[in-house]
């Protein structure tokens, strides 16, 4: 994976880990994305981040962006959060509150 899309990829992974589909219903993130029944209940924030990630990936092969560049290189902004979620070092209630807060900010 090109370095310019790593932050978007981790943002999607974190959002999916915080989603009710994973936290409450105990599905894995891939099932939440692939299954249309589960997919319709994903938070808008996760869907928006997924679209940004896919646009970034599309930009990698887009010849018009070869000269202007796709996006800035990865900043490592989500590395620690991603690491904690992967290793299970988190409080599920706190993560659900973060998702609700982020989702409510996006609707405003």
Swiss-Prot record:
It comes from the Eukaryota. A motif (Cx10C motif) lies at residues 21-32. GO terms for biological process: mitochondrial cytochrome c oxidase assembly. GO terms for cellular component: mitochondrial inner membrane; mitochondrial intermembrane space; mitochondrion. Residues 18-64 form the CHCH domain. Keywords: Disulfide bond, Mitochondrion. It is found in: Mitochondrion intermembrane space. A motif (Cx9C motif) lies at residues 46-56. Disulfide bonds join 21-56, 32-46. It holds the Pfam family Pet191_N. PROSITE patterns: CHCH. The twin Cx9C motifs are involved in the recognition by the mitochondrial MIA40-ERV1 disulfide relay system and the subsequent transfer of disulfide bonds by dithiol/disulfide exchange reactions to the newly imported protein. Involved in the assembly of cytochrome c oxidase. Belongs to the PET191 family. This is Mitochondrial protein PET191. The lineage of its organism: Eukaryota, Fungi, Dikarya, Ascomycota, Saccharomycotina.
